[in-house]
Amino acid sequence: MKCPHCGNNGSRVVDSRPTDEGRVIRRRRECEKCGFRFTTFERVEATPLLVIKKNGSREEFDRDKILKGIVRAAEKRPLNMEQMTDMVDKVENKVRSLGESEISSQIIGEYVMNILVDLDEIAYIRFASVYRQFKDMHVFLDELQDMMKKDEEKEKE
């Protein structure tokens, strides 16, 4: 593996362990030339999955695009990168477990929101406002009222 520090092609594996319930191998490597240590992740290459966007166009499923949306929604919130990456893993696993070659962006967005609402309600509202394209304050307030009703129901249980 090429060293990200000096560009040398030789490195050795210092530590290797499974993560993400065994679906990913995390490897700590050390450059044989400069001694720089870095981490790599190895996962099974998944079959192509196309996302059908709202306008009908299709693009390949992109984990990073989902992560960027979550990071943007969680800005200045108490969610760490590991929690957000775990969210993306859960969404991708759920999407791929459906066994379909295509999935709508709406379904992916709903999966993200279903996980995000339990982790951070403010980040959820931010994500939902972009994803659902709130047209005005009334739609925004309706979403907040729905969340408040769900909270009240949880408290009664």
From Swiss-Prot:
Residue span(s) of domain ATP-cone? 49-139
User: Which cofactor names does the annotation list?
Assistant: Zn(2+)
Q: Which InterPro entries match?
A: ATP-cone_dom, NrdR-like_N, RNR_NrdR-like
What does the note accompanying the cofactor annotation read? Binds 1 zinc ion.
Q: Name one GO molecular function term.
A: DNA binding
- A Pfam match: Zn_ribbon_NrdR
Q: Does the keyword Zinc-finger apply?
A: yes
| Positions of region (Disordered) | 1-21
| Keywords for the protein's UniProt record, in alphabetical order | ATP-binding, DNA-binding, Metal-binding, Nucleotide-binding, Repressor, Transcription, Transcription regulation, Zinc, Zinc-finger
- The answer to keyword Disulfide bond applying to this record is no
> What does the record list as GO biological process?
negative regulation of DNA-templated transcription
Q: Where are the zinc fingers (unnamed)?
A: 3-34
| Purpose | Negatively regulates transcription of bacterial ribonucleotide reductase nrd genes and operons by binding to NrdR-boxes.
Q: Which family does it belong to?
A: Belongs to the NrdR family.
HAMAP family, alphabetically?
NrdR (MF_00440)
By what name is this protein known? Transcriptional repressor NrdR
